C-alpha cells in the first residue's frame, strides 16, 4: 500500500502489514487561524481516536490526500 504522509503530497510505501491509509484531523488553540491539525499515515487497522478527533480510513493507494481547508 502507498499512502500520503505529509501535506506536500509526499507518499510512502507502507510497512508490511499496514494496509490502511488514514487522515486524522483535530482542532487545537490555533484552529480558527490555521485550520485543523492533520496527520496522514499508514496503519494495520483504522486507529481509534479520542472525542474531537476525526479520522478517515481507506484501503487503496493514494486515498488519503491532505484535506482542503475552507477558511471561515
From Swiss-Prot:
Q: Which InterPro entries match?
A: Snake_3FTx, Snake_toxin-like_sf, Snake_toxin_con_site, Toxin_cobra-type
Identify the stretch annotated as signal peptide in this record: none
- Record keyword Disulfide bond present: yes
Q: Which residues cross the membrane?
A: none
Instruction: Name the GO cellular-component terms.
Output: extracellular region
Gene3D superfamilies to which the protein is assigned, alphabetical: CD59
Q: As annotated in Swiss-Prot or TrEMBL, what is the tissue specificity of this protein? A: Expressed by the venom gland.
Keywords on record:
Acetylcholine receptor inhibiting toxin, Disulfide bond, Ion channel impairing toxin, Neurotoxin, Postsynaptic neurotoxin, Secreted, Toxin
- Output the CDD domains linked to this UniProt entry: TFP_snake_toxin
* Disulfide cross-links: 3-21, 14-42, 27-31, 46-57, 58-63
Q: Where in the cell is it found?
A: Secreted
Any one Gene Ontology MF annotation carried by this entry is: ion channel regulator activity
Entry's family note? Belongs to the three-finger toxin family. Long-chain subfamily. Type II alpha-neurotoxin sub-subfamily.
- Name the job this protein performs: Binds with high affinity to muscular (alpha-1/CHRNA1) and neuronal (alpha-7/CHRNA7) nicotinic acetylcholine receptor (nAChR) and inhibits acetylcholine from binding to the receptor, thereby impairing neuromuscular and neuronal transmission.
Q: What is this protein called?
A: Alpha-elapitoxin-Djk2a
Amino acid at each position: 500500500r502507498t499512502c500520503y504522509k505529509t501535506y506536500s503530497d509526499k507518499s510512502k510505501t507502507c510497512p508490511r502489514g499496514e494496509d490502511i491509509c488514514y487522515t486524522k484531523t483535530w482542532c487545537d488553540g490555533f484552529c480558527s487561524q490555521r485550520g485543523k491539525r492533520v496527520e496522514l499515515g499508514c496503519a494495520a487497522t483504522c486507529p481509534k481516536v479520542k472525542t474531537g478527533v476525526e479520522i478517515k480510513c481507506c484501503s487503496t493507494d493514494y486515498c488519503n490526500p491532505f484535506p482542503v481547508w475552507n477558511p471561515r
